[in-house]
Amino acid sequence: MVFCGLFSELIKGHSSSNNNGTNVSLAKTIQTNIRSQYSSDLSSYASACKKYSSLKSFDSLLHERTNSIISSLAAQAKTRSLNIESLMEVYGYLLELNQDTVRVIIESKEDVLKNNDLKALVDVYFKSTSKTLDFCNTVEKCVKKAEISQLIIRFAVKQFETETVDTDLGESKKKKYVKTLEEMNKFKAMGDPFDGEFVTQYKSVYDEQVLLLDELRKLKVKLGKKLRNIKTWRILSNVVFATAFVTVFVLSVVAAAMMAPPVLSAVASGLTTPIEVVGMWCNKMWKEYEKAVKRQRGLVLTMELGVQANNVTMVNIKFEVENLSIRISSILKTVNFAVDREENEMATRFAMQEIKKKVEGFTEKIEEVGERAANCSKLIALGRLVVLGHILGLHIVEGGAANIISSV
């Protein structure tokens, strides 16, 4: 869905610098006018929720899940910056919404098969999920690079242990750890596999997904009069709209919170007020978000300027909180320490002992991120296959539907 496609680059954009020192302008990305642009669509959605019990149930579940993710992120923001675990939690939320939409499309099977206009709506689903798959592929490529880095540093540790017990110093004592240092230089040359392309694409993809939301609105206007009395059209179009709209909201909140964490607390506090009118909770959330962003706008822009002025080192940048990159950065620093003091045996021994402590956590995090990316890619691909099968009337993928739904 649009929502998964949006998040697919958020994790790429949480860092503010790439290899060339350029910055992703998150402050310019933050959306504050979406609610006013889609006010009529929100009213239409609220009316449809009152009319159709299935849509009302969907709205209740969407509301509950959105409350949960915003509250969870707000709690995290009180004690620390948002990190990769936070972003993966958001990704899980968006993935659940994707599966909910798959269910709705499957339930609308017969009508979609008979109606070319409804197929156009489903096209929006395929456009957005293709972005999600691209993201998963990017993550998996970075994980493979990280795995190579891990093998190199593990070999360096093994080499160090061998050279430590080697009493045959040969020509000079300073050459005792020469092979260890060679391997560490290789690791250093690999750099951070999660830097570069991985952290620079958020802005462009975010804009593209907002345009996709606008495309959806135009499609609704075009077909709305023609299909206004068709129950399936009203339910399906409102499900797609609501999930797309809420996704833009959640990702806008996260983008703002990376600059100014108080935005999350302000939005979360607004969720505690009961909302009487079904379907209008998302409108209220946007209001709270807009007020919070206006209050924090100066801080957001100030912090962005601070990032631009202080991107000399990753560890001093507020947004470089992704745990795997931090582990890699930590190991790289220790490698630099050893390499810069290659003639000092004690320095090398100290550095290698530190690396041995850090490499286990590095390995575990690589595996975790790789498994997450592979699983998400599989679920999204299967969801696309299930939807396509239902549109074409191919029942060979019925088993896949059960699998994807049970995976949520």
Swiss-Prot record:
Q: Which family does it belong to?
A: Belongs to the UPF0496 family.
Q: Which residues cross the membrane?
A: 239-259, 262-282
Q: What are the entry keywords? A: Membrane, Transmembrane, Transmembrane helix
Q: Does the keyword Cytoplasm apply?
A: no
Q: Which residues form the signal peptide?
A: none
Q: Which domain of life is it from?
A: Eukaryota
Write down the membrane topology: Multi-pass membrane protein
Q: Which InterPro entries match?
A: DUF677
Instruction: Spell out the protein name for this chain.
Output: UPF0496 protein At5g66670
Which compartments is it annotated to reside in?
Membrane
Species annotation: Arabidopsis thaliana
Q: Does the keyword Aminoacyl-tRNA synthetase apply?
A: no
Q: Which GO cellular component does the record give, naming just one?
A: membrane
